Amino acid sequence: MIIIKCGIYHLRNDDIQGDVISRYRSYNVRPLAFIFDAYVFSWFWDNMYALLVTIIVLHVLNLYLIYKICEKMGIYLSAFCLCIFALCPILVESIYWISASTRIVFSLFLCLSSIYLLLKSFDEKNDSKKLMFFYSAILLNLMCVGFYEQVIALNLFLFIFLMICLKKYKYIWIPITSTVWIGIWYVYFMMHGEMQARGALNISGMLETTVNCVKMIFTNYINAYSNFIYSLGFGKEAVLSSLVTVFVAILFVAFMIYIYKKEANLGEKSNTTRKIIFAMIWIIVPFLPFIVLDTKFIAVRNLYFCTFGIAVISEMILDLVLSLVKNDNAKNIIKTSILAFICFFFIISNIDGVNNYRKVNSIDEKVTKQIIENVPAEAFSNGKSISINYDANDLFKYKNLSIFVESTIESDWATVGKIQVMRKSTSAPTIYVNSNQDKADYVLYFDGQMNLVKN
């Protein structure tokens, strides 16, 4: 559904801007993220659909790697938590917003691949392959910390926990080395660079920041829940009025059959203590950077990691409740039915996103096209500025009501990315939205129908 939703319509591509495409600046606090933006992900610029499919494949591979790693730890994950993590609507921003997914999903893939290859090296008998797996694991681990602060923390704790479980203590130096090198990089940004706030420590205000982080996490989940419930009505209408009903029905039956067989074979195999600790690492650790570093905002995309941990804990609670059911066959049917219905409603919520994209993207396209057609070409060169002005009420009318999909034209940096995508150009003008009319080189006004009225 994410492919259908995002492949048809233009994606938000805000951070891939002219200065990132054309050159790498040493002041970027996430070193590999900006290198990959400029020299890897920019290759997909003319085919964002291909990039999105790639990200979704990585998301699925992350699920597979988590599953295989957990097997080595004596933790057996059922399809219940894996499917919830795969389809939960709250993860959509982490995936469809390419500037986030290239950091979150991709860096997690590097982290998990590093752990998986190290485990492969333990079992490999051939010496040359053993060394290849081992050194590849080290390289990927050094790379994964260069993309996102949450992955830095998760990589350290997850790796160490795994080595403790397997009693491979001598390999703990691998994540420590990765953390030290990126830590030195961040210390540099406490004193230099345009992004120095991301590298500044917040020791004195940690308690207050912790409380604020908890509030923001709960707020994001509560908002997500309310938007999820709101979107069910629109999603239901889409299902009942289109052929997608057939797709959802087939998927529903497939889940019922597949999950039933999967649950029947797993039984109660997991080391419960390890499973709880493993889940808590995913829930708590990714938020530590927000407490330690001087960052003030937790977005919906930052819930990507902890949602998996919550899915694991939720499954454990459900299993505890279902332990009251004595008949194993009935227990599996109940659990399978619950999962199938959850996935069914998740899909309906995502279907609502398709309609939201139609509405929001059509307005984004309309406004951006008018900007491009009515402003001289030199206005889009670096160093120039454009002030774009809408009536606040009119803009709100076209703004998506769901947190899962955002409008491009409501923010300056996203509008820049939209213009670049439509012009197929790396030039990056400065954009002001409803501000700096006297300062900008060009000033545009739009009416209630989002038509240009004054240039």
Q: Whereabouts are the PLM-identified features?
A:
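Polytopic membrane enzymes that build or remodel cell-surface glycoconjugates and lipids
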Residues: M1-N455
